A protein has these predicted regions:
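Structural detector for short beta-strands of small beta-barrel domains
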Residues: 108-126, 132
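Beta-strand/loop nucleic-acid-binding surfaces
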Residues: 140-161
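Short peripheral tails and domain-boundary helices/loops at the edges of structured domains
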Residues: 183-208
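Short, charged beta-turn/beta-strand-edge "cap" motif at the junction between a beta-strand
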Residues: 159, 171-184
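N-terminal intrinsically disordered, low-complexity, charge/repeat-rich segments that act as generic
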Residues: 1-105
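Short, acidic/hydrophobic/Gly-rich beta-strand patch recurrent on exposed beta strands
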Residues: 130-135, 144
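Structural motif
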Residues: 167-168
Length: 208
């Protein structure tokens, strides 16, 4: 369903305003949260984001439309299983920094941009929760990006999801986006590890 795919794309994209990449954060939020705004206008906004190019690539490989819900879901969290794992968000978001020398890469910025699977560990308030996740960090030699040991992080539940301890969620820019299954969390973690391995190989070759 393209209508649901458009809402899902808006849901993951609205937080990119924090990275100063997006001027229409409130428009996207109002669309998927409150049904405000025209679908045609939201689609136009989303088509101007870098993620749309990867929706198209995934859609072509799988004979679907770019805003098909399965295409958008696969791009952001690697589920359901489709062709085009090299174009999912956690792989494609690393492309712009492939040629940057490792010591110049700020892993905290990469960590914010990546979509993380995380497990709810404790409640602070309805809008703030502790989660356990594996952050993007550098190896001891500072020559590769990797997933670090599990740590706790405070995240925002701006979407007022019904959360409880033990729930699995996706986190983007320290905001909870969706509740997911443990199977989906495991898959996203696996794909993120693969994306980092591929990035490190290319970065070593190009950033000289």
């Amino acid at each position: 369903m393209e209508g649901e795919g458009l809402k899902l794309a808006a849901k993951y994209s609205y937080v990119c305003e924090k990275a100063r990449l997006l001027k229409f954060s409130n428009d996207l939020y109002d669309y998927f949260r409150h049904g405000k705004g025209e679908a045609e206008r939201i689609e136009k906004i989303l088509k101007n984001l870098l993620s749309y190019d990867f929706y198209r690539r995934i859609a072509q490989l799988n004979h679907k439309e770019p805003f098909d819900e399965e295409v958008v879901s696969f791009y952001w969290k690697g589920n359901p299983e489709l062709k085009g794992e090299e174009w999912i968000h956690n792989a494609s978001t690393l492309i712009p920094i492939i040629q940057i020398k490792m010591h110049q890469i700020v892993e905290e910025l990469v960590d914010d941009c990546v979509v993380h699977p995380a497990k709810i560990s404790d409640k602070i308030s309805n809008r703030e929760w502790w989660v356990i996740y594996q952050p993007i960090t550098k190896t001891l030699k500072k020559d590769k990006l990797t997933l670090g040991p599990k740590v706790e992080l405070i995240v925002q539940n701006e979407l007022d999801l019904d959360l409880k301890e033990g729930d699995w969620v996706t986190v983007h820019f320290r905001k909870v986006i969706e509740k997911i299954s443990q199977k989906e969390a495991d898959k996203l973690l696996q794909l993120t590890k693969e994306a980092l391995r591929n990035f490190n190989k290319k970065n070593k070759q190009k950033a000289r």
